[in-house]
């Protein structure tokens, strides 16, 4: 169930008969959810917790996540911190350069809705006004466990997607 395959009986066929029967959608979603390559967009103190997520205690590599330096190589953007009006066009430009399918994780109160600086004239009140957000991770700053839970929620969301139109 956690790997994206919904039929437990199909997994028993692998051990007894040596083959697996699955839908192509399930296989594609399983591969996509197991190889997320995030692009960091660390803007403030939430980026420190994002660094904790990469360290040995949480080890994001075991979930197939490897930070990529270029938006053209990544399919997940983690927006962490206060997004200002001046930085918003850069965020949109980086998002537009990402490969399809692309996902966005909004990390922290500032990225989710402006946070502590919500009433400031120069702060965007949520990065979802600039880019579509798939997962919101609450907290100020959110812990590495919260980001891990957000990544697991994104993997579940990817596993529920339909890639092909059935007629």
UniProtKB/Swiss-Prot annotation:
EC number: 7.1.1.-
Any one GO BP annotation for this protein: aerobic respiration
Location in the cell: Cell inner membrane
Residues binding [4Fe-4S] cluster, per UniProt: 45-46, 110, 140
GO molecular function, a single term: 4 iron, 4 sulfur cluster binding
Cystine connections: none
GO-annotated cellular components: plasma membrane; respiratory chain complex I
Listed cofactors: [4Fe-4S] cluster
Membrane topology designation: Peripheral membrane protein
Catalytic activity from the UniProt record: a quinone + NADH + 5 H(+)(in) = a quinol + NAD(+) + 4 H(+)(out)
Family designation: Belongs to the complex I 20 kDa subunit family.
Protein name according to UniProt: NADH-quinone oxidoreductase subunit B
């Amino acid at each position: 169930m956690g790997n994206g395959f919904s039929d437990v009986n199909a997994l028993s066929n692998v051990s007894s008969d040596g083959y697996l029967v699955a839908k192509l959608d399930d296989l594609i979603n399983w591969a996509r959810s197991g190889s997320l390559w995030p692009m960091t967009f660390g803007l403030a103190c939430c980026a420190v917790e994002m660094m904790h997520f990469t360290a040995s205690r949480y080890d994001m590599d075991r979930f197939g996540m490897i930070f990529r330096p270029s938006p053209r190589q990544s399919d997940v953007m983690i927006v962490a911190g206060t997004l200002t009006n001046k930085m918003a066009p850069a965020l949109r430009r980086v998002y537009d350069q990402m490969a399809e399918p692309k996902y966005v994780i909004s990390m922290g109160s500032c990225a989710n809705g402006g946070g502590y600086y919500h009433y400031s004239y120069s702060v965007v009140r949520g990065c979802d006004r600039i880019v579509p957000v798939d997962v919101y991770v609450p907290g100020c700053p959110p812990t590495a466990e919260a980001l891990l839970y957000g990544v697991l929620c994104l993997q579940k969301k990817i596993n529920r997607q339909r890639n092909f139109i059935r007629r």
